[in-house]
Amino acid sequence: NTALIFAGGSGIRMNAKAKPKQFLELNGRAIIIHTLEYFENHPEIDSICIVIIESWIDYLKELLERYSIKKVKWVVAGGITGQESIFNGLQAIYKDCDHPEDCVVLIHDGVRPLINDTLISDNIASVRKFGSAITVSPVIETIVTANENNQIQSVTDRKLCMHARAPQSFILKDIYTAHLKAIDENIHDMIDSASLMKYYRYKLYTVDGPVENIKITTPMDYYLFRAIYEARENSQIFGI
């Protein structure tokens, strides 16, 4: 089982002028290290591939050495789009895999550090049983659609709605084949792996994840991460 960590973002929405958002720190450790440690310490994860902005590869390798992240087997330069970046990582894994029909790959965001061991295990189990695992969390507030005049068109039943999050996990052969088809058909702008697999009519199955499993994209996300992280730390220290 392999984790593919996408860390190709530049941090524009975060206003992170000095560093990409995945390298912003909390308690002295970069966000991507917080994320990687879950996969590094999980007994069912055998290897890790990281897709990163090419100019930051050397800095990432320094962090991996400093924090003893040993399972990283591939560090790959990202592409122009997120889809291309994920393909670059999948291709590196695929070339080294003797049995891609039996390899589970968990695709996760480097800036989504509030995961847990259970979520990783549940993703792997779902792929083994069904062939895919799309992490979701419940929609808490009401979802509406509006027209170009800002007039409400519909109110969607919340019970039917979920947030698609990560990890998004698949059999390596399936997701790699889907990416090859997309390249052949000149499709380069799929928003994520689940959308790509759905487009090619693969069956997708949900795995419930924690509400706090947010992607850190804006300053507000970072402050939420800090608050939740500190709450987790306090609960361990004080038994709250």
Model regions: which residues?
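Residue-level signal for inorganic ion chemistry
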Residues: 5, 32, 89, 109, ...
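Conserved N-terminal catalytic core of the sugar/cofactor nucleotidyltransferase
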Residues: 33-102, 183-185
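Hydrophobic packing residues within well-ordered alpha-helices of enzyme cores
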Residues: 14, 39, 60-64, 123, ...
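Short aromatic/hydrophobic "clamp" motif used to bind/position activated sugar donors
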Residues: 105
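N-terminal glycine-rich phosphate-binding loop and ensuing alpha1 helix
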Residues: 1-58
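Short aromatic/basic micro-patch
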Residues: 25, 114, 169, 215-216
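Hydrophobic helical membrane-anchoring modules
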Residues: 213-240
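Conserved core of the sugar-phosphate nucleotidyltransferase
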Residues: 101, 114-207, 240
